[in-house]
A protein has these predicted regions:
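Active-site or metal-binding loop neighborhoods of secreted/extracellular toxin and effector enzymes
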Residues: 121-149
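Short, surface-exposed beta-strand/loop "edge" segments at domain boundaries and coil↔beta transitions
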Residues: 32-42, 107-113, 136
Length: 149
């Protein structure tokens, strides 16, 4: 697991995810419009890189979800997130061309978040990517074709 995860939480992640199968089809938003390593940063990684604002209430340092990379079993949550990015003038300026990417989880541990948090989006998956493996997992993703509506 990522070396920046506290040891107590690393143990919890390993226990919770033991035996969990990887997902063969997941979706994520590439906020910058391309598939690159930073797209696969965990929430904590985005906090360290000043991509996300440090908000201890929203991103508690003692919860395992803060250290995961979020992916979804369906595309819809990603489309909704992109709509939010485009509605905000500030975020639209920061992320002018966000896209939905599609791929599979690997090289880490996974948990369907609702198994831990009954209030979570039922399509949300926490994915803890192994240290140094972001460049490997990004090869398993493509830009998802536009929805035909």
């Amino acid at each position: 697991l990522d070396s920046n995860i506290p040891e107590k939480l690393r143990k919890e992640i390993k226990e919770r995810t033991k035996g969990n199968a990887h997902y063969t089809e997941v979706y994520r938003v590439a906020k910058w419009g391309i598939i690159e390593e930073k797209v696969f940063l965990s929430t904590y990684g985005e906090l360290l890189a000043d991509i996300l604002p440090n908000d201890p209430e929203k991103y508690p340092m003692d919860e395992i979800g803060t250290y995961s990379t979020s992916v979804y079993t369906g595309r819809e949550p990603c489309d909704k997130y992109i709509s939010c990015l485009k509605r905000s003038k500030r975020l639209k300026k920061t992320y002018p061309y966000p896209v939905v990417i599609k791929g599979k989880t690997s090289k880490g541990c996974v948990e369907l978040t609702v198994n831990r948090d009954k209030e979570a989006d039922p399509e949300h998956i926490d994915w803890w990517i192994y240290d140094g493996k972001r460049s490997n997992v990004m090869q398993d993703f493509i830009i998802a074709p536009q929805n035909q509506e």
